[in-house]
């Protein structure tokens, strides 16, 4: 029997870039900090995919999204990104190419979801996206494949009071649905700016620190 293939996915999140590359957030130059994290990622073997889970820009400027792509992209490595509460989704759309396409790595389906709610810091996965996701999970179940889910807002309370008031409002509903499907193995998110790990049923929930934390 052939050995199973291991895939590497690099996640960037909450870079909070601005139109001005010299801009700082809480005393940190966000462009410089993103470059430092990207350089660290690039010091390892090339990944199979790069996923960016929102709040890539702090001001929603087109320049900030192009700079983000320039800093994190690697030759011939697929990039997928999605909006957070600080992002301008329409501007992101103008700056994206293949980033909107589904991503498949062997038996793994990497699914990105938009949890942004316009005008709000809290997030939610809309009903249509949930219906579509359930269909994708059922299809993966049928052929014994796996799903990695990616979005911005935290679906679980983390203990950080100021973040737990602006979490994913339907996180419990989402996790209940995921645990009906054996293909659902993990989800990654940003938003909270710190590390978070928990297992809920068969789903590993991973929150990732901000590149400018």
Predicted region positions:
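Active-site neighborhood of phospho(di)ester-bond hydrolases with catalytic His/Asp-centered motifs
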Residues: 11-13, 49-55, 79-85, 114, ...
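His/acidic metal-ligating clusters that form di-metal
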Residues: 37-49, 123-204
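Active-site gating/metal-coordination segments in enzymes
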Residues: 79, 99-124, 132, 136
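Beta-strand-turn-beta hairpins that frame and shape the catalytic cleft
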Residues: 2-11, 102-112, 137-148, 199-205
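Active-site HxH/HxHxD metal-binding segment of metal-dependent hydrolases
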Residues: 77-98, 157, 209-212
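Short, electropositive alpha-helical surface patch
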Residues: 62-78, 165-175, 202-211
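N-terminal active-site segment of His-dependent metallophosphoesterases
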Residues: 1-67, 158
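Metal-dependent catalytic neighborhoods of phosphoester/phosphodiester hydrolases
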Residues: 21-23, 52-73, 88-99, 123, ...
């Amino acid at each position: 029997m052939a050995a199973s293939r291991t895939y590497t996915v690099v996640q960037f999140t909450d870079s909070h870039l601005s139109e001005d590359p010299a801009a700082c957030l809480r005393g940190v130059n966000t462009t410089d900090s993103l470059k430092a994290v990207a350089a660290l990622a690039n010091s390892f073997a090339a990944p199979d995919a790069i996923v960016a889970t929102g709040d890539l820009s702090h001001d929603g400027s087109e320049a900030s999204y192009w700079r983000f792509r320039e800093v994190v992209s690697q030759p011939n490595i697929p990039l997928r990104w999605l909006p957070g509460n600080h992002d301008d989704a329409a501007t992101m759309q103008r700056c994206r190419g293949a980033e909107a396409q589904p991503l498949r790595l062997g038996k793994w389906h990497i699914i990105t979801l938009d949890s942004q709610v316009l005008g709000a810091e809290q997030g939610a996965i809309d009903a249509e996206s949930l219906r579509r996701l359930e269909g994708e999970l059922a299809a993966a179940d049928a052929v014994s494949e796996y799903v990695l889910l990616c979005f911005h807002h935290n679906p679980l309370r983390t203990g950080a009071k100021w973040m737990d008031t602006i979490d994913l409002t339907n996180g419990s509903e989402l996790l209940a649905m995921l645990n009906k499907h054996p293909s659902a193995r993990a989800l990654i998110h940003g938003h909270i700016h710190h590390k978070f790990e928990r297992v809920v049923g068969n789903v590993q929930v991973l929150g990732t620190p901000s590149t400018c934390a």
